[in-house]
């Protein structure tokens, strides 16, 4: 009985396969014309087909004409129908009476059509001789078998046969009517339009990349079959067949590309469009890839050579005994299509670089960034980030070696960073949009006869094994025994590992690849590119902060699905991407100041043509220093404070170029506020740092402020000018000026931390708590405890009174509004 079962099963499988093969072969026969018939047979066959087709068309038209003039049609209408019929009959009578005129017009159109056909064939032949005669066979065949071109030629030849048959009817004195005239006129117009279309297509074929359109069409057909998820894709034979077809298409794309790149013609625009088409193909493929079963023969095999250091003793013994090398393993290569497209685009990218078509490279990078969302959704984010890094390495080298314009250098650096930013944004959006249904599977799909997966997290061997086990349980026990939580746990593990992989890729991009780009550009004195990368740091931090928050939340949530501890999950890492990035950022901010200052000085007269990165650098530097005071990071503060005065004074001088042109009297107070803001910010930060040194008891803070002031501010009467400007600020009218809100935020951040410091002792004094310590400075500037204002004065006044006044003559010293310095000097 068992033997009979296997025979029947074999017959059934053979029959099903033969049916599939027949349908597939039949479909190919309809799409591709047989190539093994002779030229004469092909011509006769086409003539016969056109002749038979036109016989049916003409017969149908003649029948319509006869119906229009028949008496029976009068029964279906009233006077209007009769008038229409009379008009048709009069037209038909005139046509037959003057059939010579119609025959002459038709003969003229036939002649014109013949001329069109001859001209077009001549154009095709000249194009072939110029572009394709010496091309590889695969390329010339693509040109020869162009579907649209052949259809246009077929349209002209069909019309010629149609017209000749009508002339034959006229010679035979067979009546023709208005319907035949209308159809003939329409076909004549079609010929004219076809000629215009074909002429335009001839010019299109002057770009030899244009012949690849049919290859892309075949690739998209293959992807369409992969998406069907039914008969063909579920059969191993057809999976392998589609893979072979795709490989042939990729071979043609490679050959076309290599042939074009070897020519000396300038084809940068065509190469750029070709690269974009490849990215679009990859985009479509990633839309369908997650639906392909993990064990499909669509995926190619890859050889992994075994290593001696981790080989089994039996393998090593066998190799030593036979004198051979270790063997190899064969695994599925799930990235074979991506790798082939990558090779093609790498050659194109190198061509654009060699031809100095940097604008094309920049546009292509913009297209590549659009691939980020699909990479995240399809689980290919690791490959995508690695590919971006490869491009970054190549472009880093190019920026160093080639003479870019400043705009191109800045644009290339920015696009590289923006590509990584797109990954951060798309990962966050993907995780935010993913609901709990990703891990809560549909149990009915596991109880069905066929294995179906609704999510890419179901497309794994262990999930397939659970399905097969449940099918066995149902057959033996009549019901499912495997608990639902166990199935959800297995699926949740794959989701968990996918998020971990995203975390590692974000960490690489943020804390290694982007800083490496900035470092490389700095080392090679490419200040414009480095400046742009540094300017993006705050945006990178913001996007990384949001992404890591969602990552951490999802990882913690997924760990709740781990019920069976014998199934080992990877440990949840300490999600600290932003903290690591902050350390790098603070350590490199001085380099940002350096490259930005150099760029501004070198392009002082044309700086307004570029983004105001000097202003961004100054503002973010202040933010770093404020945060360093709050977090008591002296080393960070010390390394960045030395750049503060130079950057702020440089930016003040740049702003003066524009402010000096403002002559309106009513705007002078605002002009003064903008001009003095850099001095306020420097003095404010210096004052808070000195105050923090006084409160914390760490003298390094005060020594740093005093040392830098003596070194930089006391020379050339700079300190005196500082005091004059600060005095002007003290005496100005109360109002909201530029950056006042920002200054208030800085003050609130610092004073909130300082007021809660345990080193400040308080004592009760009637209804208040006042400072109870030995510091003359704190006794002079601190308000009562829990007051709205922590300080009695502005922070910049602390710097002016306590630090600046030390180095000034008595008549040049700064005086505060309420004279608190008198108490301090006592």
Give names to the regions the model predicted.
Residues 36-54, 93-111, 135-155, 175-184, ...:
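Membrane-interface segments at loop-to-transmembrane junctions
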Residues 91, 95, 121-122, 181, ...:
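Generic, low-specificity signal for short hydrophobic/alpha-helical stretches with a mild N-terminal bias
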Residues 7-8, 12-21, 141-143, 168-826:
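Binding/recognition "hotspot" determinant
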Residues 64-73, 96-172, 191-202:
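Transmembrane alpha-helix detector for multi-pass membrane proteins
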Residues 46-49, 124-127, 599, 699:
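Residue-level detector of solvent-exposed, low-hydrophobicity positions
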Residues 1-114:
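Membrane-anchoring hydrophobic segments
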């Amino acid at each position: 009985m068992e033997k009979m079962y296997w025979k029947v099963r074999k017959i059934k499988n053979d029959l099903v396969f033969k049916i599939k093969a027949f349908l597939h072969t039949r479909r190919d026969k309809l799409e591709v014309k047989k190539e093994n018939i002779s030229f004469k047979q092909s011509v006769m066959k086409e003539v016969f087909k056109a002749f038979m087709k036109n016989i049916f068309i003409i017969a149908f038209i003649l029948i319509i004409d006869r119906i229009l003039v028949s008496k029976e049609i009068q029964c279906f209408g009233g006077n209007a129908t009769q008038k229409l019929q009379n008009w048709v009959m009069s037209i038909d009578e005139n046509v037959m009476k003057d059939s010579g005129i119609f025959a002459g017009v038709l003969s003229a159109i036939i002649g014109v059509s013949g001329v069109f056909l001859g001209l077009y064939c001549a154009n095709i032949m000249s194009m072939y001789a110029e572009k394709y005669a010496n091309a590889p066979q695969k390329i010339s065949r693509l040109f020869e078998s162009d579907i649209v071109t052949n259809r246009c030629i077929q349209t002209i030849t069909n019309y010629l046969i149609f017209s000749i048959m009508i002339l034959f009817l006229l010679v035979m004195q067979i009546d023709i009517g208005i319907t035949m005239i209308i159809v003939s006129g329409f076909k004549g117009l079609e010929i004219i339009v076809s000629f215009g279309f074909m002429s335009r297509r001839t010019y299109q074929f002057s770009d030899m990349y244009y012949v690849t359109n049919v290859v892309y069409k075949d690739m998209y057909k293959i992807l369409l079959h992969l998406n069907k998820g039914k008969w063909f894709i579920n059969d191993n034979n057809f999976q392998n067949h589609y893979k072979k077809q795709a490989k042939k298409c990729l071979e043609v794309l490679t050959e076309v590309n290599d042939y074009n790149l070897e020519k000396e013609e300038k084809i940068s625009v065509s190469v750029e469009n070709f690269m974009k088409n490849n990215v679009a193909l990859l985009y479509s493929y990633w839309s369908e890839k997650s639906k392909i079963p993990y064990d499909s023969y669509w995926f190619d095999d890859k050889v992994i050579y075994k290593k001696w250091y981790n080989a089994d003793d039996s393998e090593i013994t066998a190799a030593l005994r036979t004198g051979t090398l270790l063997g190899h393993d064969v695994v599925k290569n799930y990235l074979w299509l991506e790798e082939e497209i990558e090779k093609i685009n790498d050659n194109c990218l190198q061509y654009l670089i060699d031809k100095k078509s940097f604008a094309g490279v920049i546009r292509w990078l913009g297209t590549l960034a659009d691939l980020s969302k699909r990479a995240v959704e399809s689980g290919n984010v690791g490959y995508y980030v690695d590919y971006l890094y490869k491009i970054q390495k190549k472009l880093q080298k190019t920026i160093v070696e080639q003479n870019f314009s400043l705009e191109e250098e800045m644009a290339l650096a920015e696009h590289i960073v923006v590509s990584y930013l797109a990954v951060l944004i798309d990962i966050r959006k993907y995780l935010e949009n993913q609901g709990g249904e990703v891990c809560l599977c549909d149990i009915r799909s596991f109880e069905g006869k066929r294995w179906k997966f609704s999510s890419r997290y179901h497309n794994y061997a262990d999930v397939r094994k659970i399905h097969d086990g449940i099918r066995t349980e149902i057959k033996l026990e009549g019901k499912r025994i495997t608990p639902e939580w166990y199935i959800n746990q297995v699926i949740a593990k794959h989701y968990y590992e996918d998020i971990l992989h995203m975390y590692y890729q974000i960490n690489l991009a943020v804390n290694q690849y982007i800083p490496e780009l900035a470092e490389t550009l700095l080392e090679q004195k490419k200040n414009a590119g480095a400046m742009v990368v540094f300017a993006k740091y705050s945006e990178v931090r913001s996007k990384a902060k949001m992404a890591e928050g969602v990552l951490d939340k999802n990882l913690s949530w997924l760990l709740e699905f781990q019920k069976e501890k014998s199934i080992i999950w990877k440990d949840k890492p300490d999600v600290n991407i932003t903290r690591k990035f902050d350390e790098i950022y603070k350590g490199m901010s001085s380099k940002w100041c350096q490259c930005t200052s150099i760029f501004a000085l070198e392009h002082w007269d044309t700086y307004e043509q570029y983004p105001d990165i000097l202003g961004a650098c100054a503002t973010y530097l202040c933010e770093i220093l404020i945060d360093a005071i709050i977090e008591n990071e002296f080393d960070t503060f010390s390394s960045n404070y030395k750049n503060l005065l130079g950057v702020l004074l440089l930016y003040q001088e740049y702003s003066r170029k524009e402010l000096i042109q403002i002559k309106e009297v009513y705007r002078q107070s605002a002009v003064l506020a903008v001009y003095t803001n850099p001095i306020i910010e420097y003095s404010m930060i210096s004052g808070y740092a000195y105050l923090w040194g006084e409160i914390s008891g760490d003298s390094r803070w005060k020594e740093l402020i005093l040392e830098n002031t003596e070194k930089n501010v006391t020379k050339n009467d700079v300190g005196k000018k500082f005091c004059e400007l600060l005095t002007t600020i003290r005496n100005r009218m109360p109002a909201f000026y530029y950056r006042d809100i920002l200054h208030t935020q800085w003050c609130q951040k610092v004073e909130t931390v300082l007021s809660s410091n345990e080193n400040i002792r308080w004592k009760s004094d009637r209804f208040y708590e006042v400072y109870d310590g030995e510091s003359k400075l704190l006794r002079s500037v601190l308000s009562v405890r829990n007051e709205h204002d922590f300080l009695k004065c502005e922070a910049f006044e602390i710097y002016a009174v306590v630090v600046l006044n030390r180095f000034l003559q008595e008549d040049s010293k700064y005086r505060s509004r309420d004279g608190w310095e008198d108490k301090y000097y006592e």
